[in-house]
Amino acid sequence: MPGRTPVVAVVDDEQPVRRALQRLLRAAGFDVRLFATGADFMAHLEGVDCVILDLHLPGMSGFDVQEALAARGADVPVVVLTGNDTPANRARSLANGARAYLSKPVDDETLLHALRTLSSPTATRPRP
């Protein structure tokens, strides 16, 4: 929808991280929705253009969220942003369909570039 502000969901259990990302993303022109749990995000998925997803969440992990998105057939690009960057986590995230995998702390411009690319109306979606 031309002219519509892209909606980015931030799913992270750490409030300081959510708030910092909210400030950054709003300043960059995104509409931001904050969630502390994967289950809360999944209950409010409608209208989200892209999600920044932590892997280690209470209850439903980031991996669980990715699997739930796939099971629903939800076409929401996922940017994994984790403080626990391991080769296994990277491989599993990308295998689960993450479009970008970034480590905390992340450079603001790196994150914004990924989001602008993935939330653009012309962004290509991977085919199943």
Locate predicted features:
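Acidic catalytic/metal-coordinating carboxylates
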Residues: 36-37, 61-64
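Acidic, metal-coordinating helix/loop segments flanking the phosphotransfer/catalytic sites
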Residues: 34-50
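The feature encodes the CheY-like receiver
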Residues: 58, 86
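Active-site residues of response regulator receiver
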Residues: 54, 82
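Short amphipathic alpha-helix used as the core "switch/output" element in two-component signaling
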Residues: 42, 63-75
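C-terminal output helix
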Residues: 88, 106-116
